[in-house]
Amino acid sequence: MQAIKLVVVGDGAVGKSCLLIAYTTNAFPGEYVPTVFDNYSANVMIDGKPFNLGLWDTAGQEDYDRLRPLSYPQTDVFLICFSIVSRASFENIRAKWYPEILHHAPNIPIVLVGTKNDLRGHHDLKRPEVSAAEANNLVRELGFSGYVETSALLQTNLRELFSLAIRTATSPKSASAKKKGGFFSSSSSSSSSSSSKSSEKSVPIPPVMPPAGKAPWIDIITSSYDKEMRETLNSESFSDVKFTFFEERPVYAHRVILCSASEFFRRVFGYTLSSDQAEFKLDDLNEGKVKNIRSVTIKPNEKNDDGTKSSGEFVEISIDSSINRRVFNRFIEFLYTGVLNYLDKNDQLQETIALAESVGFKYLASACKNVLGGNEDLNPSIGTFLNDQLGETSKELFFTKKILSDIQFIVEGRSIFAHKALIFSRSNVVNALIGRNFIEREGKVEMSDDVTFDSFMAILEYLYTAHAPIEEGDSVGILVLGNRFDLRRLVSLCELYISKEIERATTIGIFRSELDIIGLLICAQRHNAPQLEKFCLHFISSNYQPMRRRKEFALLDDKTKKHIEDNQWPPIHYLRAVEDYEKEMEKLKSSSKGWFKK
């Protein structure tokens, strides 16, 4: 089986690793960590002949300009990659990549590759695209073997690309060109004259680069929004609604949550969206004209039972005697959590369907029908959708608004209205913040001076919706405040986002990057972000040479420095071997009578 060495080069973040992973695994990688250097292998059949294809991935950052060419000897074909939505990566082919290959590995065939074809035509990206015509013109200008436009995500043209690369590497024209290549010609030139063979035996072999290892995986903590909402319902804290039944215990709830979850209750309480039907009239509610409701009583109420400030009113709703308390409570639980609570198929599910249909809440009816039809595995997706919908509607109706507000936060001298029922149960810190400790402040909580308005608003939005505007805001500030409020899932979301920011900020270079990665490591250590800490430690260790030259490196404590030095990549023994190799090459150049001249 003939072995083919294929080396992939190009700017950082153009999709080189995704291209190789998608080709060798037939799947797009769900997570991507920038490559330092990596190798892949595939056995393929081309034109009825078997080939072992060695795929060499390289780092595009300028920090590795010295080490990258050590992957070039014995290469049979190069792929130079650019992203079709990054004109800078295309322009670097002529400015950087072609000259680098021409210098270190002349006469080796090159195939030009356009990546991320699936993004072509996405006008919302607002990035200048590179046309196929421009790419083909460059192929003709520089004498490349061809151009293929690909999408690793959609598997577009991947097989065509690597088939072309193998045919190019094994073509008679390519073999003839390689024989002219000198010391860095490919392994395919081993059939040249005996004098060439003896000369090539004296050429030093580059040291084998040890693997850098993969970056640690950052896990996102699973949302517990439904469990937190159930805890809020069961605690009955801050409730301003009481549903009463004939000779049965009442059910307590919260108007802000009921309105966020159900159009029926928005019409009952008079807080409708523009897409809703008109609100019910109070007279109709008290005269039995609204199905399932016998009467509604509204009483002024300044304080909750625990002495904290209330939403201003307490509403008592008498439920029609035809409605079973268990069925109605199941309905309320479903509004809060999106989870259908039942014992078995005989647990009054038909009655629950009837109630759901009478109030126009189709999702509860669907969940019950799924159980009766043996399709209960579909219900978690309904719950996830309802949790998201509740959060989004609560944001639209109530976020930072005075309507039904029962607490105010004072941040940087500005007052923010909030609703305790929508932020309760998220963490013990939050619960303590809005509880009895602040009775004397009349429902006002003043945050400390180190809390910024924008970061607090992001935290508050997360409390309402389980989503936070991390991309638009200060991700580090949100992480710090999220840790203070003990919102561990939010911290994990920030950790993942910041890790991606590190990748984006270092696509061109690491030493010259404007992002302070060492500062992020120190922040992660101080603010209980262990996943980000591990990621930063791995990144700094794996890019030790450029990172140690940054002035922030001196800020690291001795323990952290020792860990980084002990895990540095490339390791010291490899760098020493590189120095020895370079010395041997210099000796060979000086004694080879012009063999290294172009």
From Swiss-Prot:
Q: At which positions is GTP bound?
A: 11-17, 57-61, 115-118
Quick one: where's region Disordered?
A: 175-210
> Which key words are in the record?
GTP-binding, Nucleotide-binding, Repeat
UniProt GO molecular function: GTP binding; GTPase activity; protein kinase binding
- Motif Effector region — list its residue ranges: 32-40
A Pfam family annotated for this UniProt entry: Ras
The protein here is known as: Rho-related protein racA
